[in-house]
Design a protein with these regions (language model features):
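A general secondary-structure signal for short beta-strands and their flanking turns/coil
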Residues: 1-3, 16, 428, 600, ...
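Inter-lobe coupling/hinge segments of SF2-like helicase ATPases
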Residues: 199-205, 209, 213, 223-659, ...
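Generic structural motif
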Residues: 118, 180, 396, 462, ...
Length: 735
């Protein structure tokens, strides 16, 4: 007798354990670990995932129930992915059921597309004779089919029904006589059509060749320590990736290449397809279920060897995974906003340990975590310090918006930006205007002196709430709203109010003879929205492209010679300890879009804080100086990567219960290790969503395990207090 360990398909902490069931004899030949099964659970029928098969019962067999069926339509989870799901559950704080669903980007089988083909088994002359005989006997359908096959010995079955008006019965009659053969094969849905592999290789320059050869040497020697490529914008990191991929493919390995969805453009993907042809596949959020299913089926069967996609591509079921590349590794999109709140970089490193694969990270602006790890010797560091080809660095200028206001300019466009736009457009060159509204939650800043109202305890900006009060979303500190700047006494203090539509409207008035495109969440809602706008801009169907951060992510437009960042402060003073890092990244990436061809590029950075180190160093293309200042701030405030960080989020439709439970958890964990620092509880940045209230508590510690211990303590408390368990939900976020 054998027994199955099953995780029930219910994401609840109390049910987050393995339940054992008897495997009926009839199921034994078919059942595998990773299958979805039907089970009796309590008084109902449920489904669950088999994570273990054993000979030993854990409870009395007389009390054990039997599996009732296998869900034939579900996808089987690879055993390695079950192991990874268990790591995700423990490391990021989720249920096993949530983690299992995460590692299954495709959860159900999708009907295959089948293609029938008819093959002529006799000679052309015999076919012509059979056709004449069929015509004499008035078998006109057979005659038409044989005449067609005499000219073309292999035809698609669809031709019979669409053009020749022949049914399957007629074809079957000829097949039974041994005249033709009907074959059927599965067609995979391919998201890239009509691609011809050129195999064209770009010769690497000296820097690129050194980096590629060094990483290849590491792989040859079995050195699988993660490698970080710090390469300035336009330095040709992709060429290095392609060289590494080719080396792995030639040795029988498979490759996952993660690219943030916002950068996953047709232009980017085609560079891989042109080099490697149809062994490449791509996934993204706008693909159909069928396309996603086929991509993963092709990976499992070995029909494709390279998978490109956002963080969900990490769970591609390759059999010989040898290399994981994470491009633009600094991107916040690699961190999931949903439970489990995993980070693709950390998860990739864990997956690589399980499979013996190499992880290669790349960025012009590495995340502080990755650079910190490189400095500590946990990652190998390689640098590309020069732009590939003839392109030089763009000239970046900082414009002080306080001076613009004093000089009577109350618009959102500085005089210098207007001057350069007129100059570039007159030369038929293109312009990109970037408005960073990501993370914008209503900080207050003075337009006269640039002062931003910040928390005296946490060094993050205070957020204005509907009641007019200013709140810190880290520690809960509150203060009344203000109308006059406490620094200079000016009345010009408030929230920055501008969106891409307003910018577009104003630019069209200022440049009526130039074509303008806008790229934001509204204009890219449809499946091919991104591609159409980018293709139009690349083909110079527009002179000016306005957009949010999606326009500055990895796109290469040789005719763009000016980039304007309209207000750098929006990201700089978002209520987040990573605000300066995000600002540095965005300005560097934005400025890097200019002058990528052979023409000189310019970038104009508009700000009320021209002296801030993140802006100054970004304009000077000086990552090292920025890192040194920012890591000193993190050390002073005990923020990651120096300390580990855990956010405990308490949610409930009952506002009183949310506040009450927050205080209970704070009191409970106050008794924890004295080395753990606790901040809060306070209201979440978005306090109420769909009638659910959110509060949060922050924990900081040098050791990740101590934070895990606090999580277990909170989980145990919740299990023992049903009055909270039924009305409140706890979510964890580790950094």
């Amino acid at each position: 007798m054998k027994f199955a360990g099953v995780i029930v398909d219910i994401s609840h902490e109390q049910l987050d354990k393995i339940f054992q069931y008897i495997i009926p004899e009839t199921m034994l030949p078919e059942l595998e670990i990773g299958m979805k099964v039907q089970i009796p659970f309590g008084k109902t029928k449920r489904t669950g995932y088999v994570v273990d098969i054993s000979d030993e019962p854990e409870i009395d067999i007389s009390r054990m129930k039997s599996l009732t069926g296998i869900c034939g339509h579900s996808v089987t989870i690879d055993g390695r992915m079950i192991k990874l799901a268990n790591w995700i559950k423990n490391h990021y704080g989720s249920t096993m059921n949530q983690a299992l669903k995460l590692v299954m980007p495709v959860k159900e089988k999708v009907r295959n597309i089948e293609k029938k083909t008819i093959h002529l088994l006799i000679s052309k002359e015999e076919a012509e004779e059979y056709a004449k005989e069929a015509a004499r006997k008035r078998y006109t359908a057979r005659a038409r089919l044989l005449e067609t096959l005499a000219k073309t010995p292999v035809v698609d079955y669809s031709l019979l029904t669409q053009k020749l008006n022949i049914n399957l019965t007629t074809a079957k009659t000829l097949e039974n006589k041994g005249i033709i053969e009907i074959t059927t094969h599965t067609m995979f849905r391919n998201t890239i059509k009509n691609t011809i592999k050129s195999g064209e290789k770009i010769l690497l320059n000296e820097e690129q060749r050194y980096v590629a050869e060094s990483i290849i040497k590491d792989m040859e020697n079995g050195d699988m320590m993660p490698s970080l490529i710090k390469g300035v914008t336009g330095s040709g990191k992709t060429e290095v990736y392609l060289e590494l991929i080719e080396w792995v493919i030639n040795r029988g390995g498979d490759v996952i290449c993660l690219i943030p969805e916002i950068s996953l453009t047709y232009q980017t993907v085609m560079r891989f397809y042109n080099r490697f042809g149809d062994i490449v596949s791509v996934i993204n959020s706008k693909m159909s279920k069928g396309e996603r299913y086929d991509s993963f089926e092709m990976a499992k069967s070995g029909k494709i060897r390279i998978m490109i996609g956002p963080r969900s591509a990490l769970f591609t079921p390759f059999n010989r995974l040898s290399l994981i590349i994470i491009d633009e590794e600094h991107e916040s999109a690699y961190k999931s906003e949903n439970v489990p709140r995993y980070h693709a970089r950390e998860t990739a490193i864990e997956l690589a340990k399980m499979t013996g694969a190499k992880v290669v990270l790349g960025s012009a602006t590495p995340s502080l975590e990755s650079y910190y790890n490189a400095k500590a010797g946990r990652f190998k560091l390689y640098e590309l310090n020069n732009r590939a080809g003839l392109a030089g660095f763009p000239t970046a200028e900082i414009v002080d918006l306080r001076e613009e206001l004093r000089n009577g300019n109350r618009t959102m466009f500085s005089n210098r930006l207007m001057e350069l736009m007129k100059e570039k457009l007159s030369m038929k060159e293109q312009v990109m205007l970037f408005l960073n509204r990501r993370g914008y939650l209503g900080f207050l800043s003075c337009r006269n002196c640039g002062h931003v109202i910040t928390c005296p305890h946490c060094a993050v900006s205070l957020t204005e709430h509907g009641n007019g009060r200013l709140v810190c979303h880290y520690c809960g500190y509150e203060t009344p709203g203000i109308k006059i700047c406490p620094e200079c006494g000016s009345k010009h203090i408030g929230r920055f109010k501008a969106g891409t539509e307003l910018v577009e409207s104003e630019i069209k008035k200022l440049f009526p003879d130039n074509k303008v495109l806008r790229m934001d969440a509204d204009t890219t809602r449809n499946k091919d929205g991104h591609a159409k706008i980018l293709e139009a801009f690349e083909n110079h169907e527009a002179d000016i492209l306005i957009g949010t951060q999606m326009i500055v992510k990895g796109h290469d437009f040789p005719n763009v010679t000016l980039v304007g960042v309209l207000l750098a402060d929006v990201s700089l003073y978002s209520p987040d300890y990573m605000a300066a890092e995000r600002t540095f990244e965005l300005i560097t990436q934005a400025a890097g879009r200019a002058g990528r061809g052979n023409k000189e590029g310019n970038a104009v950075i508009q700000t009320y804080s021209p002296e801030h180190y993140s802006i100054v160093h970004a304009c000077n293309h000086d990552y090292e100086s920025f890192y040194n200042e920012e890591i000193a701030f993190r050390e002073l405030m005990d923020y990651p990567p120096v300390y580990n960080f855990m956010t405990v989020r308490i949610a409930s439709e009952d506002e009183q219960k949310t506040a009450e439970l927050s205080e209970k958890i704070k009191q409970l964990t106050d008794k924890a290790d004295s080395r753990t620092k606790i901040i809060g509880p306070g209201k979440a940045p978005v306090y109420k969503v769909k009638d659910v209230f959110f509060r949060q508590i922050y924990y900081k510690d040098k050791e990740h395990q101590r934070l895990q211990n606090i999580k277990k303590e909170i989980d145990n408390f919740m299990k023992e207090h049903s009055e909270y368990l039924s009305k409140c939900q706890i979510q964890y976020d580790f950094r």
